[in-house]
């Protein structure tokens, strides 16, 4: 059960770490949470949803074109992690904007937002690449690469 501390610890344990570790599990959970909210709102366009979402409302303005696409609400795990990385950065941008509102140096805020914007743009390009790799099964014949290496 994920609502119990023992269940949460199992999810965050070694067998469930995929790419970089437990951070990827968190990115996946971010995506799942946002996708659930999108389903409830009956909204499939990511930019439209983020523009109305409290934690990303102003940051979404930086991505009028970049995030203006329909999200498949049943993504594979790898894509959930990629989307979570994007969403995490957009939320961080919102927090950065709020820091600027409270008087933090505007030049540092502007620089930070530019860096995050470029990072999100780059990650969206990777995310939107639809070339999904698949498992190759029964590849025994002709697959011993050592046979093709000159010693």
What residue ranges belong to the model's regions?
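Flavin-dependent oxidoreductase catalytic core characteristic
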Residues: 1-151
């Amino acid at each position: 059960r994920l609502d119990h501390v023992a269940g949460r610890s199992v999810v965050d344990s070694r067998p469930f770490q995929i790419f970089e570790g437990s951070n990827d599990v968190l990115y996946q959970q971010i995506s799942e949470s946002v996708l659930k909210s999108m389903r409830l709102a009956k909204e499939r366009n990511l930019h439209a949803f983020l523009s109305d979402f409290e934690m990303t409302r102003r940051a979404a303005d930086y991505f009028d074109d970049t995030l203006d696409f329909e999200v498949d609400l049943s993504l594979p795990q790898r894509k959930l992690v990629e989307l979570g990385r994007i969403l995490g950065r957009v939320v961080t941008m919102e927090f950065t904007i709020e820091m600027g509102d409270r008087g933090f140096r505007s030049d540092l805020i502007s620089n930070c937002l530019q860096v995050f914007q470029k990072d999100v743009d780059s990650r969206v390009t990777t995310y939107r690449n639809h070339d999904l790799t698949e498992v190759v099964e029964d590849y025994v014949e002709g697959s011993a690469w050592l046979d093709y290496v000159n010693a």
